[in-house]
Amino acid sequence: MTEKLPLEISNDVIESFCRKWKIEELALFGSVLRRDFRLDSDVDVLATFAADAKWSVFDHARMREELSTLIGREADLIETKGLRNPFRRREILATRKVIYAA
């Protein structure tokens, strides 16, 4: 049985967003996957970018805003290579749910 996520966003919309921003893998993690997800919770999103994706800080802000609009709630967008704390990295990678893979 496929687990239903508490987000209303189509696979086509996710794929279009990922192609536009050169995202090779997009995954959810955190409370969105647990029972403590609430109406006021943000959505934690993990992105792995293509090697040729060279985005500025402003691009990341636009990306986060666009993603927040698409999912209908605040998104916290984290880049996989930015996960430097080994304990946090291990936990996120072990519990994430991939929603797009190129």
Where are these predicted regions, by residue range?
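Catalytic core of pol beta-like nucleotidyltransferases
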Residues: 1-25, 33-35, 39, 50-102
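Conserved histidines in hydrophobic membrane contexts and catalytic metal-binding motifs
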Residues: 28
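A short, structured beta-strand/loop element
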Residues: 39-45
